[in-house]
């Protein structure tokens, strides 16, 4: 069984994330979505809210075949990959700036465990501009985020900024 790990903070989960999840499902038998506990980022949503958000929004994708497991983690990404039995880490790329950071991460992860590959999926052209940080800023300022997140995630953002 080929297991992939798609890590992120998902604060909030965006349509860009969901696109990568859907496409990654074609590459693996089980996709573990690693919801990172990253205290440095100061998340808007609690870990529990983000896990629930990912679980809820991924039900429809999982219903089309394949297995999705949501797994919170706080340790090194490579340790999380080992913990869940992943042979591949899936990362989404939006722009050249993403690649520079991800390139460094691949080098470090390969040094820690050369047996775990990293696969990059380019963001769909319609989703390249979506970034969780920008979505939060738009929502905070009362803008319409419906082009960037699902209706449930949009409602959760509105509720957070009331």
Curated annotation (Swiss-Prot):
Substrate binds at residues 9, 41, 77, 91. It comes from the Bacteria. Its cofactor is Mg(2+). Coiled coil: none annotated. It is found in: Cytoplasm. GO terms for biological process: coenzyme A biosynthetic process. Its EC number is 2.7.7.3. Keywords: ATP-binding, Coenzyme A biosynthesis, Cytoplasm, Magnesium, Nucleotide-binding, Nucleotidyltransferase, Transferase. The keyword Protease does not apply. Homohexamer. Reversibly transfers an adenylyl group from ATP to 4'-phosphopantetheine, yielding dephospho-CoA (dPCoA) and pyrophosphate. NCBIfam families: coaD_prev_kdtB (TIGR01510), cyt_tran_rel (TIGR00125). This is Phosphopantetheine adenylyltransferase. It comes from Cereibacter sphaeroides (strain ATCC 17023 / DSM 158 / JCM 6121 / CCUG 31486 / LMG 2827 / NBRC 12203 / NCIMB 8253 / ATH 2.4.1.).
């Amino acid at each position: 069984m080929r297991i992939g790990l798609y890590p992120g903070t998902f604060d909030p989960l965006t349509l860009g994330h969901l696109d990568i999840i859907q496409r990654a499902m074609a590459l693996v038998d089980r996709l573990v979505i690693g919801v990172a506990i990253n205290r440095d980022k100061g998340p808007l949503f609690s870990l529990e809210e983000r896990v629930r958000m990912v679980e809820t929004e991924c039900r429809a994708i999982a219903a089309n075949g394949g297995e999705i497991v949501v797994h919170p983690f706080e340790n090194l990404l490579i340790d999380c990959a080992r913990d869940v039995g992943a042979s591949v880490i899936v990362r989404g790329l939006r722009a050249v700036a993403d690649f520079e950071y991800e390139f460094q991460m691949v080098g470090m992860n390969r040094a820690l465990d050369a047996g775990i590959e990293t696969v990059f999926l380019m963001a769909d052209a319609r989703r390249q501009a979506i970034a969780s940080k920008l979505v939060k800023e738009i929502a905070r300022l009362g803008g319409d985020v419906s082009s960037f997140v699902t209706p449930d995630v949009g409602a959760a953002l509105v509720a957070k900024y009331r």
